[in-house]
Amino acid sequence: MSGPQHITILGATGSIGLSTLDVVARHPSRYQVFALTGFSRLDELLALCVRHTPQYAVVPDQFVARKLQDDLAAAVLDTRVLVGEGGLCEVAAHPRVDAVMAAIVGAAGLRPTLAAVEAGKKVLLANKEALVMSGDLFMQAVRQSGAVLLPIDSEHNAIFQCLPGDFARGLGAVGVRRIMLTASGGPFRETPLEQLQNVTPEQACAHPVWSMGRKISVDSATMMNKGLELIEACWLFDARPDQVEVVIHPQSVIHSLVDYVDGSVLAQLGNPDMRTPIANALAWPARVDSGVAPLDLFRIGQLDFQKPDEERFPCLRLARHAAEAGGSAPAMLNAANEVAVAAFLDGRIRYLEIAGIIEEVLNHEPVTAVEGLDAVFAADAKARLLAGQWLERNAR
């Protein structure tokens, strides 16, 4: 290796960004932070810049940029501050960047992630919404640019590790019968259905296994997160929706499985810590220490599996239907979910109304073909408008 890889971290102050920085800091001769971006936790972004001395930082607006630039100057740092989506795309596609951690949550991460792909970077994809929204357009860009796309979601990273290196020839060609996505079941896996009506945001964010941000914690509680991962798996591994099965596995030790036609089932196991898939993708095809403790099977004792209940988890059903419909449906599903989850976290709707909003949006609009990025964002905007109108009529 001639020198350290230069890394841009999109979404540096979130849980994935912080875990990435933890792994990077363990290997200073391998990795050097080139750019960090943040949206709301700007004091933390300043602290990260002081600690990791990136060449660039990106923030959402000019007011914040001026303050951060002054604070960096006071700390005797020459980090340059960029602004907005243009700044995100610049640090994602910069010629000096080798790898990009795409960890901005939601639709906001699509353009900068695509910028990294189109520049032919090694893209560590934690922003599942980018692929859910743009699907075939995203994968076409990967193929045309020669970018290396490595999944960071623990489930997709597990599948990637369990598939043969030439899986791009087609799952059937390499003997794969099905992919099994594991899910913890979230905090309400055994909650009586009649109690779900009164679930609070704090309860929904109290995940029993993983430490995550608030939006993805709610998605995990509703199992929309698993639904989005189902759609993501279809695009990453060229699978049909009926080739992807969701299995509830409360211990979150098996991160996913691949079932082969000869009866073999390969699984990837590990402690539930995002530093494992991050380290795997950063170093791929090599391996480096992630800082994660070794798995102790004797302490775990047993592994359990359950079939998801669609009455309890209607968002999983809606996501599978969107995957089967294709076209604009996944982008609309994602947008409606983002609006509904934000309203729930703000106390404007009840937990069970999240799925209701999404279903109403999907039923309102016919599925259309998505032939360009403008069509993706048009579907996204339409779904947000419809979800917003529902809130105007019904929110508390």
Swiss-Prot record:
Its EC number is 1.1.1.267. InterPro entries: DXP_reductoisomerase (IPR003821), DXP_reductoisomerase_C (IPR013644), DXP_reductoisomerase_N (IPR013512), DXPR_C (IPR026877), DXPR_C_sf (IPR036169), NAD(P)-bd_dom_sf (IPR036291). 1-deoxy-D-xylulose 5-phosphate binds at residues 128, 154-155, 184, 207, 220, 225-226, 229. Its cofactor is Mg(2+); Mn(2+). Keywords: Isoprene biosynthesis, Manganese, Metal-binding, NADP, Oxidoreductase. It catalyses: 2-C-methyl-D-erythritol 4-phosphate + NADP(+) = 1-deoxy-D-xylulose 5-phosphate + NADPH + H(+). PANTHER family: 1-DEOXY-D-XYLULOSE 5-PHOSPHATE REDUCTOISOMERASE, 1-DEOXY-D-XYLULOSE 5-PHOSPHATE REDUCTOISOMERASE, CHLOROPLASTIC. HAMAP family: DXP_reductoisom. This is 1-deoxy-D-xylulose 5-phosphate reductoisomerase. The gene is dxr.
